[in-house]
Amino acid sequence: IINNGGGFYRTEFYIHEARMQGGEIEGPCINNSVAETTLYGKTIYLGFSLIKDLQASTIQKILEERKARGAFTSFHDFSSRLSIGLDDVNRLIRIRAFRDIEYSKTELLWQAQRIDQATKHRDDQHQQRMFQTPIQQVNLVELPSLPVEDAFDAMELLGFPLINPFELIANPTKAGLLAKDLPNHIGKVVSVYGYLVTIKNTSTIHRDRMLFGTFLDREGYFIDTTHFPEITKRYPVIGRGIYHLTGKVAEE
């Protein structure tokens, strides 16, 4: 389902379900990923094809070069072996595809820009490889990226974060019940916090709009909700995010 672009739910939630079943999710990796998402034992490597706007030709070059000459040992090694546009290199850096072999994202983005500028000044525009002329190595000041920066880059490039979305709240809260608590509160009004999975629009016999929602609690378990017309008007669901939900617990 992941390699087919998802199904009823977005790709994010099939990956989430794999994690809940014990899978260890790894973002795209320059030495371990292929075009499609792949399972190695319990580890799931997301495929390069999930990266927004990454060119198919770039994916093909990476896989062919890796097959022909083995794994990449450093960013400089990668740069010297492949001819890839700066935009695609930056996408790979921002998704942390080089995390097993090299510097932080900030340092690599600087290196990529420097190499690209050096390449543009070369006289021979028809050479097969971008970086055959050695680029002088420099000692870089360590500039570690923050997990929240990685998460927002993943949201832009993959369409979803690779961490629990509740970790992205400015003021994280442990208030509210969890899905596992709800059976003990049948008939009571409770509050929960939920990350929106999907929302279904429908109408009453009087043509008033109402909603059926599905959310994840902070532990990753599903909560189903019904939003009656008056509540739908007063508290519209406006898009992806984490919602504070208050309502009466009902048992199906």
Q: What role is predicted for each listed range?
A:
Residues I1-E252:
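Noncatalytic, beta-rich nucleic-acid-contacting surfaces in large DNA/RNA-processing enzymes
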